[in-house]
Amino acid sequence: MAEISAKLVQELRQKTGAGMMDCKKALKETEGDVEQAIDWLRKKGIASAGKKSDRIAAEGLVDTYIQPGGKVGVLIEVNCQTDFVARNDAFKTLVKNLAQQAATADSVESLLAQPYIEDANLTVDEAIKQTIANLGENIQVRRFINFALTDKTGVVDSYIHTGGRVGVLVELNSQSEAGAANEEVQNLARNAAMQVAACPNVEYVSVEQIPAEVVQREKDVESGKEDIANKPENIREKIVQGRIEKRLKELTLVDQPYIRDQSISVEDLVKQVKAKAGEEVEIIRFVRYILGEGIEKQESNFAEEVAAQMGVK
């Protein structure tokens, strides 16, 4: 098979937190397939399913815009090169304006082509270039998403954590406009966004939203773990099922202990709000952005560091 590169080992280490030699062995066993290598490490008990990269390295801001009335919301990430610029008022103003303009855009390209909100003689792209010239750093709109309640009643709300490093956008549906305007319902939308920010492993609202292929992957991983290999099949199946159920709940928002009251789950909180509002209320979807997630600083020498330790030229 092809030689395992230092870059592949680096990628696997970032995704799992496993040791270098374990990562190298996993990649050899799976012929360089990173996703299969992750599962191999998990089966060996070396990698945690919830491990996130600890080498996220990009500056900038994650910000949000909620249209008055709470029917349209935006989550946006804009990157720069240093924290110094990220804290600059001109950069912050630019990001705020871009978040508002992204409410009517369907792609980064279409956003860049819009007339700029503070000067219609400029496009957004030209306004960004002017800011680059003024601040002396590259600035890029990395991504954004917008939620719009066009044919539904409900609330869109958001939460920004740690000074613009983590942001969450949440959509919540109600049966009526009166329900959407209910203070308890509006608080639920904000608290749900805060909950998602506090639970980095949560990826879905409920178990029902988890794709079948994700469930099957978890089953394959749990079934292949060595600690149950010698147990009778019926016992093994029960252990696997229990572990899968636990793992799936770790991925879902409604199954989390509520951050403001650990004695209840988020699902319990939703039920309480339904009772107070007198109608059905449901958390529909959410998106979480973590600043710089998956981006490496240009000056990082981590791959070279790995190569040196592996003896790779």
UniProtKB/Swiss-Prot annotation:
UniProt-listed SUPFAM superfamilies: Elongation factor Ts (EF-Ts), dimerisation domain, UBA-like
Region of interest (Involved in Mg(2+) ion dislocation from EF-Tu), residue spans: 82-85
CDD domains given in the database record: UBA_EF-Ts
Entry keyword set: Cytoplasm, Elongation factor, Protein biosynthesis
Origin: domain of life: Bacteria
Cellular compartments annotated: Cytoplasm
Gene Ontology molecular functions: translation elongation factor activity
Main localization category: cytoplasm
Pfam families per UniProt: EF_TS (PF00889)
GO cellular component: cytoplasm
Recorded family membership: Belongs to the EF-Ts family.
Function: Associates with the EF-Tu.GDP complex and induces the exchange of GDP to GTP. It remains bound to the aminoacyl-tRNA.EF-Tu.GTP complex up to the GTP hydrolysis stage on the ribosome.
NCBIfam families: tsf
Listed name of the protein: Elongation factor Ts
Organism from which the protein derives: Trichormus variabilis (strain ATCC 29413 / PCC 7937) (Anabaena variabilis)
Designated gene of the protein: tsf
